[in-house]
Amino acid sequence: MITFNNTKTIYDLVKRVGTEFENQVFVRYEKDDTIYEKGYGTYTLDTMAVAAYTERQNRKFGHPIHAALLGKCGYEYLTVLLGVPCAGGITYPADIQLNNETLVENFEKADIDILFYDRDFISQVQYLKENCPCIKKYICLQSVKNVRTVPQ
C-alpha cells in the first residue's frame, strides 16, 4: 500500500506504483486510429530508464541536470517528467504558449542542460538551437521508439 510514511520521494512513488499496480492500465492513447495502452509496470520500467540516462548525464555534466520539457502531455512526456527527478535532476515543464524569446529567457534563468521536446514544436527548437547556448542536448520525445533506449 502506498502511504505517506513509505513514500517520501518521487523515486519511491514511481517504484511503488510499478509494484502495486503493475498489471493495471496507467494510460490509454490513440495514435493513427489505433488505441494503445501502457501499464504501471511498463511505465515504471520506462521511467527508471530515463532515470538511468539522467544519472549518466549528471556524471557527464558534473552536476544534477536541469531538463526542460517542451510539448503536450503524453506518455513519453510523463516518463521524463518523473524520470529526471528520480535520479536527482530537475524537470522544468515549459509553457508551450510562450513566445521564443521568453522561452530562451526562462531556459537561461533555469540553467537548462537538456531539452526534451515534442516534434510538433520543431520550429521553436530550431530557434532555441540558434539562441539558447545553455542547452547542450536536444532529444525529440517521439524519436525514441522505446523509452528504455534513450540516447547516450
Residues of each region from the PLM?
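Alpha-helix N-cap/helix-start and coil->helix boundary motif
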Residues: 44, 74-75, 100, 122
